[in-house]
């Protein structure tokens, strides 16, 4: 399965059966067969086996676990990577919406850094996610794709607002906004420059 539309995000954000603490986040995923298989696949990233990564399998495993088994921030990180690595504007925007939705729905509850004991670790993980997002955004190309550019920008604006509300590190998001603006489609950039000239 590949995420290509907003409707595909809904099962990922929906609650799961409650655990022993009454939190609707399903079961612990670590050490499950799917979790270990996903970890093994993503360990290839950045290694000599990078070109052998089965991104479709990794994405399917992550979707299945988050939708049907348990909410886990490490699995979320892998899924975000799957959505972002191609430089596809639509899927990149969906990755930002997914992260925003998770912050709203189950970020503070999810394994393995759930509850008060994970309060210091979750911001670090968020920073790791956003730093990688910034790095992968370099591959985006919005030439003749103004709709994709606007989708990414609007999604990022919502994520920035929510990150500020939750006091999460946002430096990479600010840099990402500057990078997106640099990648603004030419016709849109020319219009913005023209408006700026008229205003002066």
Segment roles from a protein language model:
Residues 1-114, 124, 198-200:
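N-terminal domain-start signal
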Residues 110-200:
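Mid-to-C-terminal functional-domain signal that highlights helix-capping/loop sites
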């Amino acid at each position: 399965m590949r995420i290509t539309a907003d409707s595909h995000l809904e099962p990922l954000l929906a609650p799961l059966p409650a655990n022993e603490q009454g939190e609707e986040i399903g079961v612990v995923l670590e050490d499950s067969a799917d979790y270990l298989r996903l970890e093994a696949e993503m360990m290839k990233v950045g290694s000599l086996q990078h070109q052998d990564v089965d991104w479709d399998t990794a994405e399917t495993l992550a979707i299945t676990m988050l939708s049907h088994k348990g909410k886990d921030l490490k699995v979320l990180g892998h899924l975000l990577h799957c959505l972002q690595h191609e430089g596809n504007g639509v899927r990149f925007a969906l990755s930002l919406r997914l992260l925003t939705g998770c912050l709203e729905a189950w970020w503070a509850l999810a394994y393995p850094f759930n509850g008060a004991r994970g309060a210091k670790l979750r911001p670090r993980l968020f920073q790791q996610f956003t730093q990688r997002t910034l790095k992968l955004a370099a591959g985006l190309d919005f030439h003749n794709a103004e709709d994709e550019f606007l989708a990414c920008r609007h999604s990022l604006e919502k994520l920035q607002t929510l990150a500020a509300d939750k006091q999460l590190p946002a430096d990479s998001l600010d840099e990402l906004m500057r990078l997106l603006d640099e990648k603004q489609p030419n016709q849109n950039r020319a219009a913005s420059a023209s408006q700026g000239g008229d205003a002066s």
